[in-house]
A protein has these predicted regions:
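Short beta-strand-to-loop junctions in surface cap/lid or active-site-entrance loops
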Residues: 105-115
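Short beta-strand element of the alpha/beta-hydrolase
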Residues: 114-123
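Rossmann-like NAD(H)/NADP(H) cofactor-binding core
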Residues: 106, 149-151, 219
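Primarily recognizes the serine-hydrolase "nucleophile elbow" in alpha/beta-hydrolase
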Residues: 170-181, 186-227
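A fold-wide structural signal in alpha/beta-hydrolase
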Residues: 116, 145-149
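A glycine/proline-hinged amphipathic helix-loop "lid/cap" segment
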Residues: 1-103, 107
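Catalytic nucleophile-loop/oxyanion-hole region of alpha/beta-hydrolase
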Residues: 129-130, 136, 149-187
């Protein structure tokens, strides 16, 4: 399991024009299959997994209590995590969505950013929000020098596919057009965890196939997820 320091170091490396890991280098260093054996899991990781299982097992499934109730419960701290802590540094602005709706972007930026990280939150495409991990986004901005832009994409089941991917694509396209003017830097990175990682990959594919601009994103931060 990667620690936050490793993740931040990786983002910082991609944000540095001289620190990009090329595709050729990546191909010569494939993942060691031994990393995926059961005995490769450390005792610390096993202990953490056991704690998570105990915390999550008593919780009702969202489809039983309803998505809206599950989201509200998460915000009250009824679950494995405490109530979210909001950053006083966060700035929210909205961009127009494809269906005439507003897409909020939650921005936490350091002084003189050297790049922009498009963050897509997780939550199984149903839960979570752009404002529910401000402390992590603050650390990301401060440790990497990146402006962090977290997109508040529409959630299922109220907004079924492709609503969420559409909103993420529009956020990425907005950064392609406006990052340099808004943040003084046009080096773009993208990432997220769980469903956020899935949406990050889907967004990159759309940027490549529909906008011919995949090379504008110089790095990805895919913590875990279905991709």
């Amino acid at each position: 399991m990667l620690g936050m320091s490793s993740v931040l170091a990786g983002l910082a490396r991609f944000a540095d024009p001289g620190g990009i890991v090329t595709g050729e280098l990546a191909m010569t260093n494939p993942l060691d299959p031994a990393l995926f054996r059961a005995d490769a899991v450390t005792e610390d990781t096993r202990a953490l997994n056991e704690i998570l299982v105990k915390l999550l097992t008593p919780l009702p499934d969202w489809w039983v209590v309803g998505a809206a109730n599950a989201r509200e419960g998460r915000r009250r701290g009824n679950g494995p995590f405490p109530p979210p802590v909001m950053s006083t540094r966060a700035v929210v602005r909205s961009i127009p969505g494809r269906e005439g709706h507003a897409i909020p972007l939650r921005i936490i930026a350091p002084e003189n950013p050297r790049g922009v990280y498009l963050h897509i939150h997780g939550g199984g495409w149903v839960l979570g929000g752009a404002d529910m991990q401000d402390p992590m986004l603050e650390r990301t901005a401060d440790k990497t020098g990146l402006a962090v832009v977290s997109v508040e994409y529409r959630l299922a089941p109220e907004h079924p596919w492709p609503a969420g991917p559409d909103d993420c694509e529009i956020a990425a396209h907005w950064l392609l057009d406006h990052a340099a003017d808004e943040f003084g830097a046009d080096r773009l990175l993208i990432g997220g965890a769980s469903a956020g990682a899935n949406l990050a990959v889907a967004t990159l594919l759309r940027v490549r196939d529909k906008h011919d601009a995949a090379d504008r994103f110089v790095g990805t931060n895919l913590l875990y997820g279905p991709y």
